[in-house]
UniProtKB/Swiss-Prot annotation:
Family that this chain belongs to: Belongs to the ClpX chaperone family. HslU subfamily.
InterPro entries listed in its UniProt record: AAA+_ATPase (IPR003593), ATP-dep_Clp_protease_ClpX (IPR050052), ATPase_AAA_core (IPR003959), Clp_ATPase_C (IPR019489), HslU (IPR004491), P-loop_NTPase (IPR027417)
General function of this protein: ATPase subunit of a proteasome-like degradation complex; this subunit has chaperone activity. The binding of ATP and its subsequent hydrolysis by HslU are essential for unfolding of protein substrates subsequently hydrolyzed by HslV. HslU recognizes the N-terminal part of its protein substrates and unfolds these before they are guided to HslV for hydrolysis.
Gene that this polypeptide is encoded by: hslU
UniProt source species: Alkalilimnicola ehrlichii (strain ATCC BAA-1101 / DSM 17681 / MLHE-1)
Pfam families: AAA, AAA_2
Region (Disordered): 138-159
GO CC annotation terms, alphabetical: HslUV protease complex
Highest rank taxon of the organism: Bacteria
Positions bound to ATP: 18, 60-65, 252, 318, 390
Subunit structure: A double ring-shaped homohexamer of HslV is capped on each side by a ring-shaped HslU homohexamer. The assembly of the HslU/HslV complex is dependent on binding of ATP.
Keywords, sorted A to Z: ATP-binding, Chaperone, Cytoplasm, Nucleotide-binding, Stress response
Record localization: Cytoplasm
Name of this protein: ATP-dependent protease ATPase subunit HslU
Length: 440
């Protein structure tokens, strides 16, 4: 689990997301509270439940990006899912309990990677020994003379220096279990997983011989030895524990399962049903998975939605009560667009410069050029649908279409994108509202 303070978390998010300070602060506090809870007296820990968050804001302002970046910072089991993918129990489609099953699988992968990282040195030594045994076989009986320890050490030294990397050897590897593809209707993933495991276990453990270079053999054998040193049963127990104590679920598009007041009765039956099915998970219940029972009492849920056609009050009252922290994200301004284009280390401007540089052509953006691109994006958003920062992708792609097409023929040249260049390539489209609706 991350031990970063709220201030450090916000600073890290600032590198990738412009503005939205209120949302960043709420998420940072929620993440820090996970750590704080683990520090209090054990008798009090079960009583401290997470304060779930509802993020409200138009599309393209950074709700999903905050979730993506949070996943990397959290170092905890994290899953991002769209609420629209699920249906009420009894209808065709995935039921909400599959969220927890997927979360446990993610946690097992995370814990296994950490465990294998811890035994890397032991695995590397074991892999070296296996390669040395192939190149310099040990004595098979007491009567045979064993190669001197000195020869083996000399060979080990050469191996570590990389002098034997290109030599080809034949190694015996564990064969991958036979893959069986089973097709099943949505919502039956648990059954198909169990059937696949059953078929894989039929064959038992088999080995196969492969010829490869020493360098490649060391890598493959190191992974195999690391997997051998890791206890799967311990991994599963630790993964379930992590899910119960530290996991975070990001529920996107929660507004799409709202039933609007003006719709009256009838309509989409499974919408409200999805909300009712989510209730036990968010409130705290026990979900059965193939790795054991998982309690959801201390899983943090962060829900988000644009709420264009509905309001947070259209959620069923019980679910509203389970999302006590409300954060409103602001629509982006021209100045925000300028910062989005220039400040992040992997901004759109830097991405296009790196792509065009591969052709030997230098792409340069002036300050007034970047501002003009931001103004065009904001203008198109205000005239047509406001899709936030995603509009920048469309505008930039249209602006640099000619350069991208002819970059291979412009090796050694420098192309400067200033305000005049932007007006020349996009001015007509921005003025013509009908064209901008379809093209930008």
């Amino acid at each position: 689990m991350s031990e970063m303070t709220p201030r450090e978390i916000v600073q890290e998010l600032d590198k990738y997301i412009i503005g939205q300070d209120a949302a960043k602060r709420s998420v940072a506090i929620a993440l820090r509270n996970r750590w704080r809870r683990m520090q209090v007296d054990e008798a009090l820990q079960p009583e401290i439940t997470p304060k779930n968050i509802l993020m409200i804001g138009p599309t393209g302002v950074g709700k999903t990006e905050i979730a993506r970046r949070l996943a990397k910072l959290a170092r905890a089991p994290f899953i991002k899912i769209e609420a629209t993918k699920f249906t009420e129990v009894g209808y065709v489609g995935r039921d909400v309990e599959s969220i927890i099953r997927d979360l446990v699988d993610i946690a097992i992968k995370l814990v296994r990677e950490e465990a294998m990282e811890r035994v890397q040195h032991q695995a590397a030594d074991a892999a070296e020994d296996r390669v040395l045994d192939i190149m310099l076989p040990r004595a098979q009986s007491f009567d045979q003379e064993d190669p001197s320890a000195g020869t083996r050490q000399k060979l080990r030294k050469k191996l570590r220096e990389g002098a034997l990397d290109d030599r080809e050897i034949e190694v015996e590897l564990r064969a991958s279990p036979m893959g069986v593809e089973i097709m099943a209707p949505p919502g039956m993933e648990e059954m198909t997983n169990q059937l696949q495991q059953m078929f894989q276990n039929f064959g038992g453990e088999k080995t196969k011989r492969r010829k490869m270079k020493v360098k490649d053999a060391l890598e493959v054998l190191k992974d195999e030895e690391a997997a051998r040193l890791v206890n799967d049963e311990d991994l599963k127990a630790e993964a379930v524990e992590r899910v119960e104590q530290n996991a975070i679920v990001f529920l996107d598009e929660i507004d799409k399962v709202c039933k609007r007041a003006e719709q009256g009765t009838g309509g989409d039956v499974s919408r409200e049903g999805v909300q009712r099915d989510l209730l036990p998970l968010v409130e705290g219940s026990t979900v059965s998975t193939k790795h054991g029972m998982v309690r959801t009492d201390h899983i943090l849920f962060i829900a988000s939605g644009a709420f264009h056609l509905s309001k947070p009050s259209d959620l069923i009252p019980e679910l509203q009560g389970r999302l006590p922290i409300r954060v409103e994200l602001e629509a982006l301004t021209t100045d925000d667009f300028v910062r989005i284009l220039s400040e992040p280390s992997a901004s759109l401007v830097h991405q296009y410069q790196a792509l065009i540089a591969t052709e030997g052509c230098e792409l340069e953006f002036t300050e007034d050029g970047i501002r003009r691109v931001a103004e065009v994006a904001w203008e198109v958003n205000s005239r047509t649908e406001n899709i936030g920062a995603r509009r920048l992708h469309t505008v930039m792609e249209r602006l640099l279409e000619e350069i991208s097409y002819s970059a291979a023929d412009r090796g050694g040249q420098q192309v400067t994108v200033d305000a005049d260049y932007v007006d020349q390539h996009l001015g007509g489209l921005v003025q013509d509202e009908d064209l901008s609706r379809y093209i930008l």
